[in-house]
Amino acid sequence: MARKPGQDFRSAQSGLSELKSRLFFVIGALLVFRAGSFVPIPGIDAAVLAELFEQQKGTIVEMFNMFSGGALERASILALGIMPYISASIVVQLLTVVHPALAELKKEGEAGRRKISQYTRYGTLVLATFQAIGIATGLPNMVNNLVVIDQTMFTLIATVSLVTGTMFLMWLGEQITERGIGNGISILIFAGIVAGLPKAIGQTIEQARQGELHVLLLLLIAVLAFAVIYFVVFMERGQRRIVVNYAKRQQGRKVFAAQSTHLPLKINMAGVIPAIFASSIILFPGTLAQWFGQNGESSTFGWLTDVSLALSPGQPLYVMLYAAAIIFFCFFYTALVFNPRETADNLKKSGAFVPGIRPGEQTAKYIDKVMTRLTLAGALYITFICLIPEFMMVAWNVRFYFGGTSLLIVVVVIMDFMAQVQTHLMSHQYESVLKKANLKGYGR
């Protein structure tokens, strides 16, 4: 059978067309996300709200506001952002380890994954509702004249608006994952972080222009930033490869020769979750002090002010607890997402083995030993990245828009996005090659 002229070209064009449509979908979804972050909750005085957020520097509120792309400081319907979904996902992952029914559900393949995703949505709804009620009832008590309508009506409207906004973002993230490129939730967080980058760069340049920030110091910070980004990319791509062999075996009339492959284990298996949770916990007392401890010693919660001062960025106690929290969550979350015993059992069932290690229990212990060392290295790496901005702020008295957590998220999401694009292009190249081979075989 003769091959039609231009068939390869049309196949390549089809692959590029699909990639373009996915990219345009991601861009469109991000535009909707950014537009939604400017839709305010009815009944709030914007000027009073702006003054309130000036007092929230260095608290958990500032971090969540950055993740939401500034939606929180504008009291947008998307102010809660996607954090309730992340929290619900981690809770459900923890339950799949400790709850037998969910553990079995996890093993049921695609059907089990869909069921777990549904439970995550329910958890997101519950967490978003509690957080929305907290914000709706807490905001009017933080400052006078913030709410310009009846407080009961505002509580109802704000709660419904915030919960709806979070559920919409969850749906939008799932649509990006399915119809776009990359992990939709990560891309939304990435978009929220980089949305404030132009403003931060403009403020930094203005400080340098007015002499508040020396030009040489600015150049040094830029060089260090590029060096840290390079280091993050290097560490995120790093992995330990455990050699795995498959013995010669026979299935029916087919004989499969002995094969050798490897089991890749990432240095940073936990990703950015430990940094996010550690920041949330360390900054939480300061946030409570801002909300409840503003009346000093006469307040019931006045002691929170002393705690928040001890845990303010740059303080020795803050640095030690922050580092300890990151290391703890690295080991904790890695234990949730990776099970050495399950991996060893899967290798044994498939007829694979690690050279020099007995299949089963001994293999599980060996993988656990390797993973523990990798997790320690990954935890120290994340701690180093997250503490660099803290040390620089103390040494040079310069405030950074990008903390270590934000930098990790941005770099990891970009790397994942580029890998997804490359995988998509490669899959279409393989598809084109296979079609060509099939047509040649058919034409003989």
Swiss-Prot record:
GO molecular function annotation: protein transmembrane transporter activity; signal sequence binding
Read off the InterPro entries from this record. SecY, SecY/SEC61-alpha, SecY_CS, SecY_dom_sf
Annotated membrane topology? Multi-pass membrane protein
| Record's function text | The central subunit of the protein translocation channel SecYEG. Consists of two halves formed by TMs 1-5 and 6-10. These two domains form a lateral gate at the front which open onto the bilayer between TMs 2 and 7, and are clamped together by SecE at the back. The channel is closed by both a pore ring composed of hydrophobic SecY resides and a short helix (helix 2A) on the extracellular side of the membrane which forms a plug. The plug probably moves laterally to allow the channel to open. The ring and the pore may move independently.
The record's Gene Ontology cellular component field reads:
cell envelope Sec protein transport complex; plasma membrane
* Transmembrane segment boundaries: 24-44, 77-97, 123-143, 153-173, 181-201, 215-235, 269-289, 318-338, 376-396, 400-420
Could you list this entry's UniProt keywords, alphabetically sorted.
Cell inner membrane, Cell membrane, Membrane, Protein transport, Translocation, Transmembrane, Transmembrane helix, Transport
**This chain belongs to which protein, by name?**
Protein translocase subunit SecY
Assembly notes? Component of the Sec protein translocase complex. Heterotrimer consisting of SecY, SecE and SecG subunits. The heterotrimers can form oligomers, although 1 heterotrimer is thought to be able to translocate proteins. Interacts with the ribosome. Interacts with SecDF, and other proteins may be involved. Interacts with SecA.
* Cystine crosslinks: none
Q: Tell me the compartments it is located in.
A: Cell inner membrane
Q: Which NCBIfam families does the entry link to?
A: 3a0501s007
Q: Which residues form a coiled coil?
A: none
Query: A Pfam family name for this chain?
Result: SecY
UniProt-listed GO biological process terms? protein transport by the Sec complex; SRP-dependent cotranslational protein targeting to membrane, translocation
* Keyword Membrane found: yes
Protein family according to the UniProt entry: Belongs to the SecY/SEC61-alpha family.
Organism per entry: Vibrio cholerae serotype O1 (strain ATCC 39315 / El Tor Inaba N16961)
